[in-house]
Amino acid sequence: GYSYLAQGSEGPVVVKQIHHEPCSYYQFGDKLQSELRDYRTLSALGLPMPRLLAVDEAQERLVKQYTPGPTVLEQLQTGTLPPQAEEQMRALCRLLYPAGLNIDYFPTNFILWGGVLYYVDYECNPYDAQWDFSHWGSRYWADTPELRAWLQEHGQN
């Protein structure tokens, strides 16, 4: 989906609009219900995430707590990502893997705020070693050929 910063009655919030683009390598069912199910699953595990504040099922929108700060990707680009971020990611993996889960480890999905690494997406999938942090995600959490290629492809080099 697409996420937008908006002003709620008590301050900033994030509004996520579900979208339905075709995806050749992944089959989605009901994306809104999947997002809600994943939120409940990850919340039950205790993953630090923004709270879900509201759901508009008719418009397929989620309203989430705003988590301030730069994403891990932005911190990688400026050289300001502290080592504790990757240590916290590995601690999250110790919660996820025994539960049979992976999340989207791409660094745009994480914000280090108040010393805590927050997963700002709600997506999770059944565990598959080829997509876990060590085999896939960590390739994008440092100055690697994969990250440089992604940045160039997205005009962020």
Give names to the regions the model predicted.
Residues 97-102, 112-157:
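C-lobe/activation-segment region of protein kinase-like
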Residues 13, 48, 62, 118-120:
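Protein kinase-like catalytic core scaffold
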Residues 37-48:
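Structural motif at the C-terminus of the N-lobe alphaC helix and the adjacent alphaC-beta4 loop
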Residues 82-110, 115:
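Conserved kinase catalytic-core segment
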Residues 28, 47-86:
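Conserved structural core of kinase catalytic domains
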Residues 8, 55-57, 105, 112:
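Generic beta-strand structural signal
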Residues 1-33:
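ATP-binding glycine-rich loop module of kinase domains
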Residues 68, 107, 124:
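Short, glycine/acidic-enriched loop or turn micro-motifs at the edges of active sites
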